[in-house]
């Protein structure tokens, strides 16, 4: 198999790919030590059985630029096929503010076709293509070079088998007339708000047992500082402080370093320096805040707006479960 290491090589492959009705794409990345995913490898395949119809792309090569791929993403005549696309899309959006159009997610399509919710790629390959995926390289450090033959084989199979999975699911959707369901549900994956995390909105992800507006104000400001710090330093949120530590801080409301030293859950590194200052500033801000500025949870009796496409998908799932 071929690994593309220059922009010129990727440009030639993407130019060829534009003559095909679809391409299958996957990524390998690392995120354990960073806020943003680090793209380490791309796999792309077009229909066909030739060796050159599927390639690896090395984004870590100094001579590589992904602009040819993003140009392909904008070509609406070529369907871009992914499996469980959300994390892949996040990488592309953060890198270039671009989404592949049109997008086909085989995990969404498989759900509509009765394979179950969030079905894995390995399962679809086994059931549809009748092949076994080698998962021995699943926990590879994809940033290391050179990649072994086994790692390359594992990576390329994530797009070669995907071609058969896509064609089967596409046929099933056409046969049952459910293409529109997949289109609408997949379009939700290309909503920038999913990937652009606004620090002041980060509190909505935190689970707490207390719903008082003032308590939520502490959580909001602490979550906003954590999100901003993690983004600007490109470190995981939990490296700043974990959710349970945040809830503890919202309860104890520390305003001095001595107060912080009494925390049971706060990381030692967070009890001094920039993080400690950020925590105390957040608490002080809420202490002086007008109650009208506190966040408010929606009332439980507010009418829920149900996406009709989602309702249809749920009905399909229920039917599949009962058969």
Language-model segments: which ranges?
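N-terminal accessory regions of nucleic-acid-interacting proteins
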Residues: 1-23, 27
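Active-site-proximal helix-loop-helix substrate-binding element of RNase H-like nuclease domains
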Residues: 3, 43-67, 72-163, 189-193, ...
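An active-site-proximal beta-strand-loop segment
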Residues: 27-33
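Residues that scaffold, gate, or flank divalent-cation-dependent active/transport sites
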Residues: 31, 40-43
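A short, glycine/Asx- and small/polar-enriched loop/turn
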Residues: 36-38
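Accessory DNA-binding and partner-docking regions appended to nucleic-acid-acting proteins
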Residues: 149, 169-323
């Amino acid at each position: 198999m071929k690994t593309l290491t220059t922009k010129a090589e990727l440009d030639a492959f993407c130019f060829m790919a534009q003559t095909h009705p679809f391409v299958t794409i996957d990524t390998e990345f690392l995120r354990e030590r960073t806020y943003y995913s680090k793209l380490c490898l791309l796999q792309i395949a077009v229909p066909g059985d030739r060796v050159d119809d599927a390639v690896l792309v090395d984004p870590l090569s100094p001579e590589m630029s992904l602009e040819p791929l993003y140009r392909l993403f904008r070509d609406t005549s070529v369907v871009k096929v992914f499996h469980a696309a959300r994390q892949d899309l996040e990488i592309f959006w953060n890198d270039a503010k671009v989404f592949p159009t049109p997008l086909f997610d085989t995990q969404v399509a498989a759900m509509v076709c009765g394979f179950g919710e969030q079905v894995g790629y390995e399962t679809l390959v086994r059931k549809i293509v009748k092949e076994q995926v080698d998962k021995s390289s699943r926990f590879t450090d994809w940033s290391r070079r050179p990649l072994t033959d086994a790692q390359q084989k594992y990576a390329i199979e994530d797009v070669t088998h995907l071609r058969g999975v896509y064609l089967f699911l596409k046929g099933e959707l056409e046969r049952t007339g459910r293409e529109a369901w997949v289109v609408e549900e997949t379009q939700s994956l290309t909503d920038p708000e999913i990937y652009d995390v606004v620090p002041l909105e980060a509190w909505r992800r935190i689970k707490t047992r207390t719903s008082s507006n003032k308590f939520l104000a502490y959580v909001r400001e602490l979550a906003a500082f954590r999100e901003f710090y993690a983004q600007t330093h490109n470190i995981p949120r939990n490296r700043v402080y974990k959710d349970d530590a945040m809830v503890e801080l919202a309860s104890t409301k520390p305003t001095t370093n001595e107060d912080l030293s009494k925390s049971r859950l706060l990381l030692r590194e967070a009890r001094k320096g920039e993080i400690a200052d950020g925590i105390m500033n957040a608490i002080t801000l809420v202490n002086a805040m007008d109650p009208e500025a506190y966040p408010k949870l929606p009332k439980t009796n507010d009418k829920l707006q149900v996406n009709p496409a989602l309702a249809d998908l749920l009905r399909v799932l229920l039917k599949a479960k009962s058969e």
